[in-house]
Structures are given as C-alpha cells and as structure tokens.
C-alpha cells in the first residue's frame, strides 16, 4: 500500500527549491553557481526544509520524515557521482541512500509533476501562439482529445474547447501511468 500523504508532501515540498522565473531562473543560477558547486532545485529544497525554520532546540527545519526528505532529494532519480553541496552536507548526517531509486511515493510525485508541468507548458504554448492547435492534432494523445471534445461539444467557444481537450490529455496521461504501473508490478 502506498502512503498518499507522503506522496503529496514530497510533491509539494520539492517545489520549494525552484527559483523565481522558472527554468530560465534555474539555468541562470546553475551558470552563476558553477564555480561553487552549481545549483540544483531538489538540493535547494532540502536546504530550505532542513535549515530555514529555526524554532526548536533539537533540530532546525520542518522535522520531515526521512522518507519525505529522501523523496525530495531523489525527485529526478538517483543522484549519482556529482552530489550538490547542499545534499552532500545533509547526507553526511542523514544518509539518504542517494545512489538508489526513490520510494514509490516519490516516483509518483515525480511523474505527477511531469504530467502537470507538461500540460501547463502545452496550454501556455497554445495561449502564446507558439503551438497552433491544428498542428497538435497529429500527436497521439492530443488529436483524439480534441476530436472527442469536438464531437461532444460542436459549438464550444475556443477557450473552453482548449481547456476541455487539455483536461482529457491530462486524464489520459494519468491513466497511462496507472495502467503501465499496474502491468509492471
């Protein structure tokens, strides 16, 4: 059985390490911090949740479980040889087994994050005119989603059409993850 609260805590806490301005801000920080060990948003999240709040005598931070901290650190998978400084310091005291895969809850949080940001990026791209909806119809998940919306709601205003279609894309991605996970277990 999976711990839903753990998956949710990992999903929410890992985002604390993101800098302003999204991926552009992160890329800029990586470049600026390269001489000092670089920048990694998951390592930054660990730093924030383990050091920022200083209210208690026995510990700094949010007093999260080892499993939650491990999931935040391994949001993108095992860390490998190049360990960010923020993680290296914390890992000395609390071995997060960074060379192994994260828990199922952490993997669910990571997949959920991927699904969410990919759908938001798709919506942002459509709104900004980077993607034309007609061009996206050839994509395996997107085309059928729009076709279903057009059949069910033939006179839907464009904005609602987009939202309805992307809602179906989102649901299909979630369904694919669930079905693939079930078949792999």
List where the protein language model places each region.
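Histidine-centered, transition-metal-coordinating active-site segments
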Residues: 1-5, 42-43, 48-57, 61-185
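Acidic/His-rich, divalent-metal-binding segments that scaffold phosphate/diphosphate chemistry
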Residues: 1-36, 49-57, 82
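Histidine-centered active-site/metal-ligand motif
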Residues: 14, 18, 23, 41, ...
């Amino acid at each position: 059985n999976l711990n839903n609260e753990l998956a949710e805590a990992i999903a929410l806490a890992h985002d604390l390490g993101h800098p302003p301005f999204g991926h552009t801000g992160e890329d800029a920080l990586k470049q600026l911090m390269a001489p000092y060990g670089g920048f990694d948003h998951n390592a930054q999240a660990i730093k924030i949740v383990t050091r920022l709040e200083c209210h208690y005598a026995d510990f700094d931070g949010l007093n999260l479980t080892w499993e939650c901290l491990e999931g935040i650190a391994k949001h993108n998978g095992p860390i490998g040889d190049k360990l960010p400084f923020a993680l290296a310091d914390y890992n000395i005291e609390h071995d997060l087994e960074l060379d192994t895969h994260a828990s199922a809850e952490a993997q669910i949080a990571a997949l959920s994050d991927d699904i969410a940001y990919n759908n938001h990026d798709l919506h942002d791209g459509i709104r900004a005119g980077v993607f034309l909806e007609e061009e996206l119809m050839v994509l395996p998940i997107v085309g059928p989603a729009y076709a279903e919306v057009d059949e069910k709601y033939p006179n839907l205003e464009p904005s609602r059409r987009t939202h309805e279609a992307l809602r179906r894309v989102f649901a299909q991605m979630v369904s694919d993850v669930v079905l693939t996970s079930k078949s792999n277990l």
